[in-house]
């Protein structure tokens, strides 16, 4: 038969134990460490007779899948052993004496405490109260029997004058923290996966016949290639250094320039792609510009990336480059993801306002600067300024594109 044992004072559950119905009660008590002098055992809501322990489980009325409940004989003293005595209506002297009485009744617990001369102090009431009393009272004050889990002294002070502004602020703080703790317990019980690390999205592709594991990041504006990958794939000669500058995020990184177009191979499909070449440990990042251009679809249900009618699976965690995982936690990763391009004073300004801009951008009439500047949202202007352009350039671009930030950014990068 299968028997399960539960303890009332700790909610611990033992079993189920697979036992023979011919097993004696005394053997069962030894198995579950039942102490008759301090505990009571119940079966089917009735106290089990422990006077005759030589009878079998079958003779005692136990059946398959039954549960036994073990309760302490003296709830107050038992809970005191676990640091949670019944201290309601107990004075400090009564509380200390209750603890001493429990240790007298449970010498094994006294031995586990490991205090020198404890046995002598237990038998000397005055010495026990003088030496251990302050320690027990300190623990009693730190323990809480209130919904906020704070010391009872603080809880009593707050509840004695709840209309006081200071107390109200503290109660509000405790209430909010209690709700947060409840949410945490709920999340850990029902959505434990939210506390685990999620694998990033990588796919396999080829550039000039070289296999590459590319990080797919729809949160990055631009597609990035590292300088080492550009060298390995023989694309260094195609870097337009007029687009060099500084990538600024948490830290800074050097932008060597831009590769305007090259082909990448995903399965049997060749796709044109442009890259910003950045000095970063991450080899390659597929940003939103390339994903939008080829109308890519990130299918998390099937764990694939659909692009140009081709499905390519995302790599399992075991195949993700370890150095790239480290790169995602460094400041350089933030530079790559945000792609907040800021030109330095020496080369960046020439890169963005050089010959390429003179050819592709129409010249702004000089009278424009004297006209009243249309009012655009400060957040839109800031987005363009964060890309490395001056406030004046940002406003002019917004003026030309009717306030569309995306079009304005494209215009400025031409």
UniProtKB/Swiss-Prot annotation:
Major localization listed first in the record, in broad terms: cytoplasm
Active-site residue list: 217
MF terms (GO), sorted A to Z: aspartic-type endopeptidase activity
Domain Ubiquitin-like: 1-77
GO CC annotation, single: cytoplasm
SMART domains: UBA
Alphabetical keyword list: Aspartyl protease, Cytoplasm, Hydrolase, Protease, Protein transport, Transport
One Gene Ontology biological process: protein transport
UniProt domain UBA: residue ranges: 375-414
Subcellular location per the Swiss-Prot or TrEMBL entry: Cytoplasm
Assigned EC number: 3.4.23.-
Region spans: Disordered: 342-372
Entry-linked Pfam families: Asp_protease, UBA
Role: Probable aspartic protease. May be involved in the regulation of exocytosis. Acts as a linker between the 19S proteasome and polyubiquitinated proteins via UBA domain interactions with ubiquitin for their subsequent degradation. Required for S-phase checkpoint control.
Assembly, per entry: Binds ubiquitin and polyubiquitinated proteins.
Family: Belongs to the DDI1 family.
Protein name per Swiss-Prot or TrEMBL: DNA damage-inducible protein 1
Species, as recorded: Kluyveromyces lactis (strain ATCC 8585 / CBS 2359 / DSM 70799 / NBRC 1267 / NRRL Y-1140 / WM37)
């Amino acid at each position: 038969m299968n028997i399960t044992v539960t303890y009332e004072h700790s909610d611990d559950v033992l079993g189920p134990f697979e036992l023979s119905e011919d097993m004696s009660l005394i053997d069962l008590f030894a198995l579950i460490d039942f102490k008759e002098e301090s505990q009571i055992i119940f079966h089917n809501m009735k106290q089990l007779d422990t006077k005759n322990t030589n009878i079998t489980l079958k003779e005692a009325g136990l059946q398959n899948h039954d549960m036994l409940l073990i309760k302490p004989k003296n709830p107050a003293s038992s809970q005191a052993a676990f640091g949670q005595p019944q201290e309601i209506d107990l004075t400090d002297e009564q509380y200390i004496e209750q603890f001493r009485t429990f240790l007298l009744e449970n010498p094994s617990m006294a031995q586990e405490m490991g205090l020198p001369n404890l046995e002598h102090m237990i038998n000397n009431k005055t010495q026990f109260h003088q030496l251990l009393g302050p320690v027990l009272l300190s623990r009693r004050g730190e323990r809480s029997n209130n919904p906020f889990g704070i010391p009872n002294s603080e809880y009593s002070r707050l509840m004695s004058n709840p209309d006081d502004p200071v107390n109200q602020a503290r109660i509000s703080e405790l209430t909010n923290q209690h709700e947060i703790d409840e949410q945490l317990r709920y999340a850990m019980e029902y959505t434990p996966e939210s506390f685990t690390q999620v694998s990033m999205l990588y796919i396999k592709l080829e550039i000039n016949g070289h296999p590459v594991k590319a990080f797919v990041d729809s949160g990055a504006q631009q597609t990035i290639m590292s300088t080492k990958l550009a060298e390995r794939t023989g694309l260094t000669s195609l870097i337009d250094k007029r687009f060099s500058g500084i990538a600024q995020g948490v830290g800074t990184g050097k932008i060597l320039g831009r590769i305007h177009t090259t082909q990448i191979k995903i399965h049997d499909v060749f796709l044109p792609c442009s890259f910003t070449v950045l000095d970063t440990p991450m080899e390659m990042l597929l940003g939103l510009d390339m994903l939008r251009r080829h109308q890519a679809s990130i299918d998390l249900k099937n764990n694939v990336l659909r692009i140009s009618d081709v499905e390519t699976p995302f790599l399992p965690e075991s195949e993700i480059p370890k150095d790239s995982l480290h790169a995602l936690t460094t400041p350089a990763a933030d530079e790559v993801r945000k792609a907040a391009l800021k030109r330095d004073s020496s080369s960046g300004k020439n890169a963005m306002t050089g010959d390429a801009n003179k050819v592709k951008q129409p010249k702004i009439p000089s009278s424009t600067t004297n006209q009243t500047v249309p009012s655009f949202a400060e957040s839109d202007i800031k987005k363009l300024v964060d890309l490395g352009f001056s406030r004046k350039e940002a406003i002019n671009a917004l003026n030309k594109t009717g306030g569309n930030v995306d079009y304005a950014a494209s215009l400025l990068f031409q």
